[in-house]
């Protein structure tokens, strides 16, 4: 609050409890799915086929892969477990999409097409006759009008038990961390003693190249 000029057109969307995914479609209509770290996701053929069946080419879809439990809530642990299984395909994945970028802008790492135009294109594509609406879902984006409207979203997020919500400014695509994409989340502070930790290797993309680095994977507290 206070950091955003609402006249610049900021859009809010619920922060989902899923796994970030980029679906890259080439000029031959072939779709490849990647994690945020650049690792290919091979358990999502249902999503891959659903995108390819629309006939879209040369676009990148940014969103999250979710599994819904019996109450309709995202099951983060469940989707992580399914994604890690070998020789397996997830039966009912939901690809919740919040951006659609032309591949030329994605490859350049920046673009001039504003968010509102990208969302308009995404909504039209998602509503097409060949789109499987159950597998490919559009994440609603709501323009925030003023500070009171922002506080309404803040309260809604807390009441619904959301992970938080995202704010996106109406600017062109930026393929890096940016002040034009803000995560709004309330934190509950507490102090714990770390009694042990573990590390693991992870594949990340830096300057267009894949690198394997050691990262903190988990901690034990008391």
Model feature map: region roles:
Residues 106-112, 176-180, 205-208:
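A short secondary-structure junction signal
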Residues 97, 193-196:
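A structural signal for short, hydrophobic beta-strand segments that form beta-sheets
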Residues 2-133:
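Covalent nucleotidyltransferase
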Residues 6-8, 190-192, 217:
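Short beta-strand or tight-loop elements
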Residues 139-189, 196:
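Amphipathic alpha-helical
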Residues 199-203:
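Short, conserved beta-turn/loop elements at beta-strand boundaries and strand-helix junctions
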Residues 129-143:
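Short, basic, glycine/proline-bearing loop/turn elements
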Residues 205-210, 215-220:
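Short aromatic-glycine-enriched beta-strand elements
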């Amino acid at each position: 609050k206070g950091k955003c000029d609402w006249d610049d057109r900021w859009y809010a969307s619920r922060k989902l409890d899923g796994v970030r995914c980029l679906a890259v479609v080439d000029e031959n209509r072939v779709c490849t799915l990647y994690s945020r770290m650049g690792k290919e996701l091979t358990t999502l053929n249902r999503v891959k086929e659903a995108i390819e069946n629309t006939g879209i080419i040369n676009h990148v879809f940014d969103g999250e892969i979710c599994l819904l439990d019996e109450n309709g809530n995202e099951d983060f642990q469940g989707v992580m477990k399914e994604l890690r299984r070998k020789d397996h395909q997830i039966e009912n994945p939901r690809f919740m999409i919040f951006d659609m970028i032309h591949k030329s802008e994605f490859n350049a790492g920046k673009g001039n097409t504003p968010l509102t135009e990208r969302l308009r294109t995404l909504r039209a594509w998602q509503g097409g006759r060949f789109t499987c609406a159950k597998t490919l879902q559009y994440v609603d984006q709501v323009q925030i009008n003023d500070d009171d409207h922002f506080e309404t979203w803040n309260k809604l997020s807390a009441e619904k038990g959301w992970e938080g919500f995202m704010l996106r400014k109406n600017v062109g695509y930026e393929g890096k961390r940016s002040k034009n994409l803000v995560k709004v989340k309330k934190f509950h502070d507490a102090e714990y003693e770390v009694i042990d930790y573990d590390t693991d290797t992870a594949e990340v993309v830096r300057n267009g190249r894949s690198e394997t680095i050691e990262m903190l994977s988990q901690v034990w507290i008391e």
